[in-house]
Regions:
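Active-site neighborhoods and metal-handling regions in enzymes and metal-associated proteins
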Residues: 1-469
């Protein structure tokens, strides 16, 4: 098997690096045979501890540039490791159909002997693929994709802890930003609905920009235990810029914050114990009725998906509409997927599952211990944009019945930060949504309390006060 995706190589050998911005991976390849394992990397990047780990586990470290010639040797059955593992059955037969569960059109089992080379056609670079004979290639989705997506108990615990610390950083950021918007711009603030004080808005000498405030958010995250950097470049967007789904501000051209406009921030971090991703949309002035109703529709879809119960074997594609239906009722929608997979101190986007309106041949059913985001939105060109995002863990759930003996699944939220109440039209929420929102906010107070000081906790208590149905 030839492994080329950097996150799969990192996961396979349990190594991390810093060769790629925002992704803790190292430029490397891997080749795994029935009795050998090879790691192709710049050897100067490896610490003595990593070298010892590789040696103890029978992994042969080779120079990064050797992978090309070694693939040629692999194709002719001449690639041999000095630390080959003994005791394997010669020429074993492997049931690929059951082993990979790729979801491809060909679902029948394929038997092969160990001179076939497993290559993921959706990931392998042509430079290596071209060195192989077509009749010796098994073109299947990588067998590492699914086990990497199925988080083990240590990874799940790490993700939960990382999201708690990250949630505390987001709350600290909102507390700081709320104060700054009031002091510098005369904004009514996070809680009050009123027009900004124009006179005070004009008097301020210091300005807040999309870049300067996102830098401050990074400062709060950097103060947290195990922080190693951002997991992607922060989307910090105000007003019409928030309508650009993948907007990335530049210091020279970014907008200044405006208390009379929506502010959307989509951000995340890399911690040693987990990767985070969160989006919140806020307003520090008086939101329009249209902004409030749009945000409420997005929130209703977010809650609906997060509360879904579904049978084993269901792909995320089948759940996507749950997040869109509240928007569809108004004739609104959004042009991106609703949920992406997330790594464990790895890529913030990874495979092989997703929640999207568009089905994918490589998509696999949602399974217990997978991590996925829940992030519906709405974007109105030249006006505003809204997105709300939490990370979810797939878990088993108890249902009154069990049709088909399939077993049923649900989601567990692991992201903790308040939803702005003044952007919510409570009159269109059903009692179940109000109950969920109040329970979620109560958990925010309980879970984040140990990480906040007195003033920050007072702010959070106010931000999470129960909503009356």
């Amino acid at each position: 098997m030839i492994v080329t995706p950097l996150d799969e190589v990192a996961w396979l050998y349990n190594v991390r690096g810093s060769d790629v911005s925002y992704c803790p991976v190292v430029h490397a390849f891997a080749i795994v045979t029935i009795d050998s394992a090879f790691f192709y990397v710049d050897k100067q990047k490896l610490s003595p501890e990593t070298n010892s780990f590789m040696e103890e586990n029978g992994i042969m470290v080779r120079n990064y540039g050797d992978v090309s010639s070694d693939v040629v040797l692999l194709a002719s059955n001449q690639l041999i490791s000095s630390s080959s593992t003994k005791g394997f059955e010669e020429n074993p037969k492997i049931d690929v159909g059951n082993a990979t569960n790729t979801g491809n059109s060909s679902s029948h089992a394929v038997e092969f002997v160990n001179d076939l080379i497993w290559v993921d056609p959706g990931a392998c670079c042509f430079a290596l693929y071209s060195k192989l004979s077509v009749d010796k290639v098994l073109p299947q989705q990588s067998p590492l994709a699914l086990p990497k997506a199925l988080k083990n108990p240590v990874e799940i615990e790490g993700l939960k802890k990382a999201h708690i610390r990250d949630g505390a950083a987001v709350v600290q950021y909102l507390v700081w930003l709320d104060k700054q918007m009031q002091e510098l711009y005369g904004a009514s603030g996070y809680f009050m609905e009123a027009e900004s004080t124009k006179e005070k808005k004009q008097l301020g000498t210091r300005r807040l920009t999309e870049v300067s405030v996102s830098d401050k958010l990074e400062e709060f995250r950097a103060s947290k235990e195990h922080f190693r950097g951002l997991s992607f470049r922060t989307t910090s967007s105000v007003g019409s810029n928030a309508a650009i789904i993948h907007y990335k501000p530049e210091a020279e051209t970014c907008a200044e914050l405006d208390p009379d406009c929506i502010y959307l921030f989509d951000s995340g971090a890399q911690y040693l114990d987990g990767t985070t991703d969160i989006t919140r949309t806020v307003h520090f002035g008086k939101p329009t009725p249209h902004e409030k109703s749009s945000n409420t529709a997005v929130l209703k879809g977010h809650i609906s998906l997060g509360n879904a119960r579904f049978p084993n074997g269901i792909n995320g594609h089948a759940l996507d509409a749950l997040a869109r239906i509240p928007l569809w009722k108004y004739g609104l929608d959004y042009k991106h997927g609703t949920g992406h997979r997330i790594g464990s101190y790895l890529n913030v986007h990874e495979g092989p599952h997703q929640i999207s309106l568009r089905p994918s041949a490589r998509d696999l059913p949602l399974q217990v211990s997978m991590a996925v985001t829940d992030e519906p939105g709405y974007y109105e060109d030249r006006n505003f944009g809204i997105r709300i995002e939490n990370v979810l863990i797939v878990k088993e759930c108890n249902t009154k019945f069990n049709f088909g003996d399939k077993g049923y699944l649900s989601f567990e939220h692991i992201t903790w930060a308040p939803y702005q109440r003044k952007l919510i039209d409570v009159s269109v929420l059903v009692p179940e949504e109000v109950e969920w929102l109040n329970e979620y906010h109560a958990k925010c107070r309980e879970i984040l309390a140990p990480y906040l000081n007195t003033s920050e906790m007072e702010w959070l208590k106010k931000a999470t006060e129960p909503i009356a149905a």
